[in-house]
């Protein structure tokens, strides 16, 4: 009798799991997928023990993103910055840090807003240290590394987009996307948190959980997502506070190295969010540059989604006007 009951219970559980699996697939969920981007584009990143990943030195050639597009080059210098059109290392430096919008993903080397600014500046060397996928915390870690290897940096500009707040805390949703894009070199992610006194806490890189059969079962893939979501939930609630502490640390490190620091907003924000940042920046004596990328089809790369060369050009003009040292003799 006990064996019969156990068998019945076992088959009931199997049937229930099977029905859940079918239900998930019908409603659009599926097994874990990792897309092999190496089939269609060069791999531009390599693993980094502390940063998670870093740009791969050399020139990377991309096919057109659409029938209307063109071949583009993404060239990474020996110092891991992107080419901006000037090799004069004797000049004082203005450096930009941030994610893919700052880096200029999907446009050519000389079509990024940093390159457009460089073309107008003969006095300063403009260095673009933006890295695709980076948030504020990775940019902070990179900034520390930059200061260890560079002198004569007069100005540091952090190019912010709202999604950086999600990246800073290794939110479950972002970890899922990084896993999907992992063939681009995104494997592990360092993240930030804060303690009870709102002090910034630095956490070592982590990776997405890959359970057995997650690439075969929608149910197991869903369980992976839930686990990552639960693990990051408390940090996500504090993501704005964490973002502020990261920015404060960027400003502090810049000042300690005799550099000015500016906070650059590259995406339109709701008024409430802008006001919160303005209050924070004023309180901490940090300068704001508000130059969001323009919207509209002509301002994004077709079939890719990142800002186009025209979008970068327009934004570069806005940024140039806001950098006082570029507008003085």
Predicted features along the sequence, with ranges:
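Short, amphipathic alpha-helical "lid/cap" segments that border enzyme active or binding sites
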Residues: 136, 140, 240, 244, ...
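Helix-to-loop transition at the C-terminal end of transmembrane segments
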Residues: 23-34, 168-169
């Amino acid at each position: 009798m006990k064996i019969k009951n156990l068998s019945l219970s076992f088959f009931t559980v199997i049937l229930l799991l099977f029905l859940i699996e079918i239900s998930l697939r019908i409603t659009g969920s599926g097994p874990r997928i990792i897309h092999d981007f190496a089939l269609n584009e060069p791999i531009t990143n390599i693993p980094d023990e502390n940063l998670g990943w870093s740009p791969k030195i050399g020139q990377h050639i991309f096919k057109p993103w659409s029938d209307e597009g063109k071949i583009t080059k993404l060239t990474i210098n020996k110092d891991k910055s992107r080419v901006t059109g000037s090799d004069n290392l004797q000049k004082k430096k203005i450096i930009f840090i941030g994610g893919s919008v700052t880096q200029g993903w999907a446009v050519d080397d000389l079509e990024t807003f940093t390159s457009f600014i460089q073309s107008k500046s003969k006095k300063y060397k403009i260095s673009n240290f933006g890295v695709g996928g980076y948030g504020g915390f990775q940019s902070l870690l990179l900034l520390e590394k930059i200061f260890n290897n560079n002198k004569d940096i007069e100005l540091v500009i952090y190019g912010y987009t709202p999604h950086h707040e999600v990246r800073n805390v290794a939110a479950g949703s972002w970890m899922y996307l990084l896993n999907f894009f992992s063939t681009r070199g995104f494997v592990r992610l360092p993240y930030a948190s804060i303690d009870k006194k709102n002090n910034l806490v630095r956490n070592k890189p982590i990776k997405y959980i890959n359970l057995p059969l997650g690439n075969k079962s929608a149910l197991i893939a869903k369980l992976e997502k839930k686990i990552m979501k639960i693990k990051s939930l408390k940090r996500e609630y504090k993501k704005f506070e964490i973002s502020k502490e990261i920015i404060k640390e960027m400003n502090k490190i810049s000042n300690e190295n005799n550099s000015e620091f500016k906070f650059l907003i590259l995406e339109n924000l709701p008024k409430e969010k802008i006001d919160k940042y303005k209050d924070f920046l004023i309180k901490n004596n940090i300068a704001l540059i508000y130059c969001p990328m323009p919207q509209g089809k002509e301002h994004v790369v077709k079939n890719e989604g990142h800002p186009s060369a025209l979008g970068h050009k327009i934004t570069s003009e806005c940024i140039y006007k806001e950098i006082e040292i570029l507008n003085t003799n």
